Design a protein with these regions (language model features):
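Surface-exposed interaction regions enriched in Ser/Thr/Asp/Glu
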Residues: 217-221, 286-300, 322-329, 333, ...
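Long, charge-dense tracts
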Residues: 89, 96, 102, 122-129, ...
């Protein structure tokens, strides 16, 4: 089938001066919110003066540039954009695109945390365990090298003096914790500690002490706290920071009191608790798990992936990820444990290579590690508790192998998460029903080399990836079979081995169309190609009924291509200008430009097709203008003329409505091109098309050109055996076509050469005229010293009688240097010996003034040659579709060898 034409949407970027392709090194991406919001964007070099203000540009599907703002607080978001195109990874989900800089090493926040007031052992707790008579309760503070002891002795139980607690509390006859604590607090408050201030808070059964430095500087000061009593310390105890078990902590304390529980298991079982008072100040409350106040609070958000947030239609903001309120940072820090019980994720200190979503988790690939966030908490990579592990805790797992494994690609499948490194592939899965830290397993599944700069893609149930050689590209297909089985891997590019060049650097897929495509984009180190290499399959159940490789030639240097549903979007560059174009991959277009009398809807098969206009607004807009003096129509184009392409115009309309408002529906012609003060236009001589201005479409021809392989006799109905040695004489070929218009057939026979002209280079002449036409469809051959030259090294202008070939660089003249004479370059210009074959068709009928299309036709091509003596091509460059459905042949088959019967 002839490829669809690309519709011109808009010129989205024009260079500041000249024809320099200023977006050539950009990282391009595609965002699909819904059918109304579709965007194409790119990340540029912020250090380039042309892009300093806008290092990210985004356009909607109409080609209108969107507003992109860059937050500068808490850090300048632009600083994150400091690398090249291959070092960005972009992951889009709904309204948020996660942008990862693969060269940015992730850092933790400072240790100790910035602004912390915590000083180890600057707080203490004195707890009365039991109240006894005639006991001396002692408390000693040691600040520096100085001891500050205080004590209180309880009354003797035999003292029978009458008590008068109302008038003289110190004469109280009963021992109470309150009396002991009051006395100790009074004594502690009376201490004079040079350069320090001691604060004592009395609770029901304990005293809380804190020591601060007087004046500026460190607010808190460390001290040693010890207690004893006259019976060996069984009635009173104290601690500053550490306890052996949680049971040693008092039921009452002050808000924010922190304590470290050092269990028998050592550092791996140590945890921190913080007291939260019921009234927010002191008294009763609860001890809750907290983090070590001396360790980092978490991750430095400025070094982590940033988000491109679609805040409104055509409006984006680039920033550190934030919560739904738009002000609170989304990255969560460490809230419990320390660097042992709640360590940093493995990507800290290294670079993140790719981000992904899987099983309701955000994941990162770093070196040979896979890190996944807490379940349903995408920006949290720290544990819930230092005491136990939960199923929703983060997953951090290593895929160590005997081969170097630096992960750079990931794709989810029903069997698990497929991980890709340069030399090996892995699967991350869980034998349990859900993926948890304890059930996650990584296992190697295959060992294929792949290009680390081209991400793998999935096409339905198949995964495709590429491997580069010094001269061409291999393409593999992988189908997983389960966590315990190796996948089935096929070299799907074997049939076109060495056809796909090594310059491709992008791979995309369209699962609903069973299609993959490869292309090389425009960049400083490589001028963008105009070709897309595509592979399409047709499956019925588990069987591949048909598969084919083919190539599309786009109207400009390809910068970006993406397929959304059944629409292919592309950005192409020409003379420094960037055009947004689109094509429908189905026969039913989204917009109807032409409808035949029997209701068939088609779009023009022209490149850069658009309604005639010069692209200006208001009274300056010109569409179709008739010049009565010269008797020609000017059909204006809204973009820079593609001088290497053949222009074409087409009259659109709707034949199913009795051609209402249309007088020449389906009329097409190849015009000439010209320019005036209103812009560039296509010139149609001898016709006044101004009355049809709304129906005039302008664009460029492109070729549908298929060279068929050799024909051999099939020995078995299944097509498993062919007779390659037999003498096969083809009498005629019959081609069945579907919905099609003009189609031609060309044959090249051995021993036949077209007209030839020879010249000799003189070092200055670049243009050489030949006395015969050179038609692209017949094949043009230009040789220098016998070597065929690429079409990009010369240009051709032709008429019906002659043609001129103009070289980009003049062929060299004869020269002599160091007694060595180099002859002048010999120039040969000829055709590729393809000639048109007139077909035979049955008589038919058509509706006058309708588009020249038929639902089905059969063309009979006379050949009368041996199958190895000719080649045949199917060719069309009309602005209408062509659908080749089948081919049959008639002829004489004669086996060459005797056979036993």
């Amino acid at each position: 089938m002839k490829r669809p034409g690309f519709k011109f949407v808009k010129t989205i970027y024009t260079p500041s001066s000249g024809t320099n392709p200023e977006l050539k090194d950009a990282k391009w991406f595609f965002i699909k919110r819904d059918n109304l919001e579709t965007y194409i964007g790119c990340i540029l070099d912020k250090d380039d003066s042309n892009h300093t203000a806008k290092p990210i540009r985004i356009w909607n599907k109409d080609g209108t540039e969107c507003t992109v703002t860059f937050e500068s607080s808490p850090a300048d978001a632009k600083l994150y954009l400091d690398t090249t195109r291959d070092n960005y990874d972009i992951l889009t989900v709904q309204d948020t695109s996660i942008i990862t800089n693969k060269t940015k090493a992730v850092a933790a926040l400072p240790t100790p945390p910035t602004g912390t007031t915590y000083v180890a052992n600057s707080r203490g707790t004195v707890r009365i365990k039991t109240v006894a008579y005639s006991i001396k309760y002692e408390v000693n503070l040691k600040v520096g090298s100085t001891n500050y002891p205080v004590s209180f002795t309880t009354i003797n139980a035999e003292d029978l003096t009458a008590a008068d607690s109302s008038s003289n509390p110190s004469d109280e006859k009963y021992n109470t914790a309150k009396r002991i604590l009051d006395s100790l607090k009074t004594a502690l408050d009376a201490l004079s500690i040079s350069g320090h201030t001691l604060t004592v808070t009395k609770l029901d059964s304990s005293l809380e002490l804190s020591l601060k430095t007087t004046g500026s500087g460190t607010p808190y000061a460390a001290f040693e706290l010890t207690t004893t009593d006259s019976q060996g310390g069984i009635h009173i105890d104290a601690f500053t920071e550490q306890v052996g078990t949680q049971a040693e902590l008092p039921a009452q304390s002050v808000q924010g009191r922190e304590a470290k529980v050092v269990a028998l298991g050592g550092a791996n079982e140590t945890f921190w608790l913080e007291f939260f008072a019921d009234d927010g100040t002191s008294g009763r409350g609860s001890w809750e798990e907290s983090k070590d106040p001396t360790v980092s609070d978490g991750l430095n958000a400025a070094t982590l992936p940033h988000e491109l947030f679609n805040s409104a239609s055509n409006t984006f903001v680039f920033r550190q990820p934030k919560k739904a309120d738009g002000s609170t940072l989304a990255w969560k820090g460490r809230v419990i444990g320390d660097t042992i019980t709640n360590s940093n994720p493995s990507f800290v200190g290294t670079t993140i290579q790719q981000a992904f979503y899987h099983n309701n988790r955000l994941g990162f690939l770093t070196e040979d590690n896979v890190s996944m966030s807490k379940s349903n908490d995408f920006f949290n990579f720290f544990y819930t508790s230092a005491l136990t592990s939960t199923d929703d805790d983060p997953i951090d797992i290593n895929c160590s192998s005997i081969r170097p494994a630096v992960l750079h690609g990931v794709l989810p499948t029903a069997q698990g998460l497929i991980l890709f490194s340069r030399n090996q592939q892995f699967i991350l899965f869980s034998d349990a029903e859900i993926l948890t830290p304890s059930s996650a397993v990584i296992r190697g599944i295959s060992n294929y080399e792949m290009d680390p700069t081209i991400d793998p893609v999935d096409v339905g149930t198949t995964i495709n990836f590429v491997s580069k050689t010094p001269s061409y590209t291999r393409i593999f297909g992988m189908q997983t079979r389960g966590s315990e089985e190796s996948p089935v891997v096929m070299d799907i590019g074997k049939i076109v081995s060495e056809w796909v060049p090594d310059t491709v650097n992008n791979l995309l897929s369209s699962p609903q169309n069973s299609l993959i495509a490869l292309y090389g984009d425009n960049r400083s180190t490589y001028v963008g190609d105009k070709n897309i290499y595509m592979f399409k399959t047709y499956n019925v159940g588990d069987k591949i009924i048909m598969q084919a490789w083919f190539q599309w030639d786009l109207p400009g240097n390809i910068q970006f291509v993406s397929v959304d549903s059944d629409t292919m979007w592309s950005v192409v560059e020409g003379s420094g200008k960037y055009h947004l174009i689109s094509a429908s991959l189905t026969q039913t277009p989204e917009e109807t430009i032409m409808t035949t009398a029997d209701g068939q809807q088609i779009n023009p098969h022209m490149d850069m097709y658009t309604a005639a206009t010069n692209g200006l607004a208001g009274g300056s807009e010109k569409k179709v203008v008739y010049d009565s003096a010269g008797d020609f129509s000017k059909c204006y184009i809204p973009y820079a003329d593609l001088t290497t392409r053949n222009p074409v115009i087409l009259i659109a309309g709707n034949a199913s409505q009795d051609f209402a408002g249309v007088t020449e529906f389906g009329f097409t012609v190849n015009p000439t091109r010209a320019t005036d003060s209103d812009g560039t236009y296509f010139k149609v001589i001898g016709k006044d098309l101004s009355a049809q201005a709304a129906n005039v479409y302008v664009g460029y021809q492109y070729n549908y050109d298929v060279e068929l392989p050799k024909t051999y006799y099939r020995l078995s109905p299944e097509g498993a055996q062919y007779d390659y040695t037999a003498n096969l004489t083809i009498a005629r070929m019959k081609f069945a076509v579907g919905l099609s218009s003009v189609v031609g057939f060309k044959v090249k026979s051995k021993g036949y050469r077209g007209e030839l002209a020879e010249f000799t280079g003189d070092g200055s002449t670049t243009a050489f005229s030949v006395p015969f036409p050179l038609k692209e469809e017949n094949g043009i051959v230009v040789k220098l010293d016998g070597a065929k030259q690429a079409s990009s090294t010369y240009s051709v202008t032709t008429t019906d009688a002659q043609a001129t070939v103009t070289f980009n660089t003049a062929p060299t003249a004869a020269s002599t240097a160091a007694n060595v004479t180099t002859p002048a370059q010999k120039i040969e210009i000829t055709t590729d010996t393809w000639y048109d074959v007139q077909t035979a068709q049955d008589l038919g009928q058509y509706l006058a003034d309708d588009v020249p299309l038929t639902d089905s036709s059969v063309f009979t091509i006379p050949i009368h040659q041996r199958s190895d003596n000719f080649n045949i091509r199917v060719f069309s460059n009309s602005p209408f579709p062509v659908a080749l459905t089948s081919m049959m042949w008639e002829g004489q088959y004669s086996p060459r060898f005797y056979r036993r019967t």
